[in-house]
């Protein structure tokens, strides 16, 4: 009860989506991005980066020392630099190459894109599940008569199953839109 809680998150968000936008996911992604940065810099010829340093970064990638980072953030008043120092305290041989040549936007902006892409993948999976369930519903109610509607008034006779196939069509179009967005990220 000591911190702000959003009712949308508490009532409606899945555990998978909550984790995707959690601080834990964010900071682990920062570490993965720092590893990728070091690997690319080494590959491009920055010879001060060694394989041993990269392996040390990988060793601590999922072991985020939050209390240490919190202490650094109080001193530095900068979240990225706090995590650079905290990671460096764990991977002491790699300390000098963490975040080398990068700006805070490197980890911040790329993490945002990664989290957005993962969220869209979660949504796509849920839409595919919805499509499957709607197909079962449409089949179960293919013979149940109902009135169709057009221009907000009753029209000709149709079936509940037929109406469900129209809902499915909308979901298919949503999935196609998601796939387009995913491919453009």
Could you describe each region identified by the protein language model?
Residues 1-185:
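A helix-coil-helix interface module used to build multimeric assemblies
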């Amino acid at each position: 009860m000591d911190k702000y809680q959003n009712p949308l998150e508490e009532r409606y968000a899945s555990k998978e989506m909550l984790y995707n936008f959690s601080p834990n996911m964010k900071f682990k992604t920062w570490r993965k991005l720092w590893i990728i940065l070091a690997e690319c810099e080494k590959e491009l010829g920055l010879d001060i980066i060694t394989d041993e340093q990269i392996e040390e970064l990988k060793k601590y990638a999922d072991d985020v020392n939050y209390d240490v980072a919190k202490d650094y953030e109080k001193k530095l008043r900068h979240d990225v630099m706090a995590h650079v120092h905290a990671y460096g305290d764990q991977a002491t041989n790699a300390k000098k190459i963490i975040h080398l040549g990068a700006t805070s936007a490197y980890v911040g902006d790329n993490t945002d894109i990664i989290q957005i892409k993962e969220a869209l993948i979660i949504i796509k999976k849920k839409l595919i599940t919805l499509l499957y369930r709607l197909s079962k519903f449409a089949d179960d109610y293919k013979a149940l008569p109902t009135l169709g509607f057009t221009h907000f008034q009753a029209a000709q006779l149709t079936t509940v199953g037929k109406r469900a196939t129209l809902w499915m069509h909308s979901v298919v179009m949503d999935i196609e839109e998601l796939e387009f967005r995913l491919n453009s990220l």
